[in-house]
Design a protein with these regions (language model features):
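Conserved active-site regions of diverse hydrolases
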Residues: 1-289
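Short, composition-biased motifs enriched in small/polar/acidic residues
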Residues: 286-363
Length: 363
């Protein structure tokens, strides 16, 4: 995560802070619903540690847990559960009470992956194009109903709605044929194209709405092909990605050797991959900014906004924008969404960048 400031240029206003986070997802996003919970899962999550919405909430300054508290304090705002398909969510939204702070809250809606998992139960092994297209269209209709209900009846104005991932890339479907994987991947691509069109329609027809669309489809592709760039390991067996539970590891402890894997079980990411999902989303909705620069005697004061809490940062700089190496001018602990840092002023002109390297610590 990187923010830029060119010395002497205009500074930027900070985005208004959100007041709450409400989540409507499937098993990947749940913090309270794991029918297989036990020693190999972190509380009632379907992973070995915190899930992405918890990390995002922390980065947004909306609450975080200590390591000793396995129960997320904001779980009452999390309406996610395993196998919550979009049709279920249409009904569940009706039972969701309108929040008093709806206009300033963030709403996460991510159930399109669940729809494809459901299709693998209801449609697969058929590759009838009409059947799959009808399923996609029904999911899109459901998502439109979800958006409009949240907007009109619940007062939501800011939504996070990620693209669907290629579910054939998860270990659950390692054994299906390459031809079938290609067919289903194309159906996901078709859905995502129509999904983006749907979100654009909502943006143009619902005044004041903002919808962020994290591209988790491309992210999963990139993580699988270059896991090391994200601090992860793509564990393989016979050329297929495997999860911690089905791998050759004998130590399945929550903070053990499997923490660097991409998948914790056959469907769900590890907590470390969850943190990557959160980082990508945080950059999209609240890009870190330098909002003001004050020249002092011997130093420059940089005021920062949208600092991702829990992800420590660096101020790096150089005297020529195009030439030379970036050097570290200061380090800081990200403890608040708005912070100030002082850097030495050792020349007539400096160009600064904010850098937040990918990092993760259990849980």
């Amino acid at each position: 995560m990187v923010g830029f400031l060119f010395f002497g240029s205009a500074v930027f206003p900070a985005q208004s802070a959100f007041t709450s986070l409400y989540i409507f997802g499937d098993g990947v996003s749940t913090t309270t619903n794991n029918p297989f919970a036990g020693q190999y899962y972190y509380g009632l999550r379907r992973s070995n540690g915190r899930v992405w919405v918890e990390v995002l909430a922390q980065q947004q300054g909306l609450g975080a847990n200590s390591v000793t508290n396995v129960n997320w304090a904001n779980s009452t705002n999390n309406w996610s559960y395993y196998a919550q398909y979009s049709l279920n969510l249409v009904t569940n939204i009706n039972n969701f009470p309108k929040p008093l702070d709806a206009a300033t809250a963030l709403f996460v809606v991510w159930v399109n992956d669940a729809d494809f998992v459901g299709d693998m139960t209801d449609i697969y092994p058929s590759t009838n194009i009409a059947t799959w297209t009808n399923a996609n269209n029904q999911s899109l209709t459901n998502h439109w109903n979800i958006i409009t209900n949240l907007y009109y009846a619940k007062g939501a104005r800011t939504l996070i709605m990620p693209k669907a991932v290629d579910i054939t890339e998860i270990p659950e479907y390692d054994l299906i044929s390459s031809a079938t994987k290609s067919f289903i991947r194309q159906r996901v691509i078709d859905f995502n194209t129509a999904f983006t069109t749907l979100l654009n329609q909502a943006r143009s027809s619902l005044p004041g709405i903002t919808i962020y669309e994290p591209d988790f489809f491309s992210l999963l592709d990139n993580v699988l092909t270059n896991a090391a760039a994200y601090g992860l390991t793509n564990a393989l067996y016979n050329g297929q990605s495997v999860d911690v539970v089905e791998s050759s590891l004998t130590d399945w402890s929550l903070n053990g050797p499997g923490t660097n894997y991409i998948f914790w079980d056959a469907i769900d990411p590890t907590a470390k991959f969850h943190a990557v999902l959160a980082d990508i989303t945080q950059q999209l909705i609240s890009p870190v900014q330098i909002t003001n620069l004050t020249v002092l005697n011997g130093s420059n004061r940089l005021d920062m906004a949208n600092v991702p809490i829990g992800q420590n940062g660096l101020v790096i700089g150089r005297t020529n924008l195009l030439l030379g190496n970036w050097t570290t001018n200061a380090t800081f602990v990200s403890s608040n969404t708005t912070q100030t840092v002082y850097v030495p002023a050792s020349g007539p002109m400096w160009f600064y960048r904010l850098k937040f390297p990918y990092s993760w610590s259990w849980p």
